[in-house]
Amino acid sequence: MEKETKSLAWPATAEFYGWVFIFSSIQLCTMVLLTVRFNSFKVGREYAVFTFAGMSFNCFLLPIKMGLLSGHWSLPRDFCAILLYIDDFSIYFSSWSLVFMAIERINHFCYSTPLLNENSKALAKVCFPIVWIISGVQALQMLNNYKATALQNETPQCFLAFLRSGYDMWLMLVYSVMIPVMLVFIYIYSKNFMLLKDELSTVTTYLCIYLLLGTIAHLPKAGLSEIESDKIFYGLRDIFMALPVLKVYYIPVMAYCMACDDHTVPVRLCSIWLVNLCKKCFSCTRREKESDLEVGIKMLK
């Protein structure tokens, strides 16, 4: 019975991954276009680029996961470990890039232009090696946990790389959400006297939203890992496994919100597109009416 449940559940999860890939690719391309093309993109642009790059790797791994979960592909465990490392590294890399982008945004509020340029250069020299090293070490720890689990399990199927344990989800929640947010909150507290009320509320709002979404994505799988979800509710295990995929949506949105000064660009672009579409529709109907009138005049003549 358990085998039948698994065989029915994996194709549904694979289909969900496919839809997530389609919509997340469209969203990621839209966020990059809005950030680079239609905004000033002056504050933290390097960190925004690194965040989008990390999430693009994570997004384009979704079709591979889809093929593995559906059973169409079969890969050795070592290659699964490589995919798992890239997946985790991209998440941590994007999360820590967001941290330094938030610090850059706070410095933009606190300092004048000469001091801001000096602090930005110093921060860029320090942050990129830190981001690479921390992300690599954190992803390596997750990889070691997977190898230990894979050795104890006799199933040679590659989707074991994507069945995360509750302990792994706790680590991901702490490493990619809790610690980065707490560090930025500490930095805000140290610069509290230099920030205006509106600026402080803007940054703290973004951090709280990121903390909430990250907790929603990782906490159910981490907290309910010991429960046999197949016996409680059919498909609950797949929901828990699919929730962490939400990061491909909220991390690019947070990068866009922190990197761009004008957040009304999407609204204005949609309004312009709708106005142009209405103009074209009205012009076409007007031409059709004029052509019918001309035909009627010719018939009368």
Swiss-Prot record:
Write down the Pfam families for this protein, in alphabetical order: 7tm_1
> Which cellular component appears as one GO term in the record?
host cell plasma membrane
* Keyword Kinase set for record: no
Gene name per UniProt: U51
Give TM segment ranges. Answer: 16-36, 49-69, 83-103, 123-143, 169-189, 200-220, 239-259
Q: Which residues lie on this side of the membrane: Cytoplasmic?
A: 37-48, 104-122, 190-199, 260-301
Keyword Transmembrane helix in record: yes
* The species this protein was found in: Human herpesvirus 6A (strain Uganda-1102)
Tell me the disulfide pairings in this chain: none
Q: How does it sit in the membrane?
A: Multi-pass membrane protein
Q: Name one GO molecular function term.
A: G protein-coupled receptor activity
Q: Which named protein is this?
A: G-protein coupled receptor homolog U51
Which InterPro entries is this protein grouped with?
A: GPCR_Rhodpsn, GPCR_Rhodpsn_7TM
Chief localization: host cell
Say which family it is in: Belongs to the G-protein coupled receptor 1 family.
PROSITE patterns, alphabetically?
A: G_PROTEIN_RECEP_F1_2
User: Where in the cell is the protein located?
Assistant: Host cell membrane
